[in-house]
Amino acid sequence: MRIYSLNGEQWLMRQAGQERWRQATVPGSVYADLMRDGTLPDPFYRENELEAFALLENDFVYQRVFEAEETMLQSRKVLLRCEGLDTLAHVSLNGQPVGYADNMHITRERDVKPLLLPGENVLEIRFDSPIRYALSEYEKRPGWCSTDAIPGFQHIRKAHCMFGWDWGPRLP
């Protein structure tokens, strides 16, 4: 078995619906990439949390272009392993759906051998807004939740403290 890591700084990211791609690092986060780019001030400083919160009402797309090595193309299977996809993630390879992640606590693996192309391949991951999802689910199934947190956080399999806590900001 050979392991090819797609981690690193070769990723690009953009807000869905916008054309401008930005440099991104994986593993990482939308917040870290937007801070590094200068688009977002430090959300842990003063009232900057509100600006960060507004940004995360949008969806974001991450993209990585990579070359499929000959050993990959000749392999019986090529598993794409995603660890820690932070929740509502649509994964595609060369425009073909590979899978969907709706739980940040589960590692995902898929055989992508049939989708690999000789030469350049494009891996794309679209992250839907966890804020919109939580609020939408809360409207359908309201229930008690912490007043310090975003309503509906209990309906999404994501670290609940990211939705706000008495000791921390609301930065899902």
Task: Label every PLM stretch briefly.
Residues 2-17, 29-38, 52, 57-172:
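Accessory beta-strand-rich segments of carbohydrate-active enzymes
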Residues 43-53:
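N-terminal glycine-rich cofactor-binding segment
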Residues 22-27:
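Solvent-exposed adhesion/ligand-recognition segments of exported proteins
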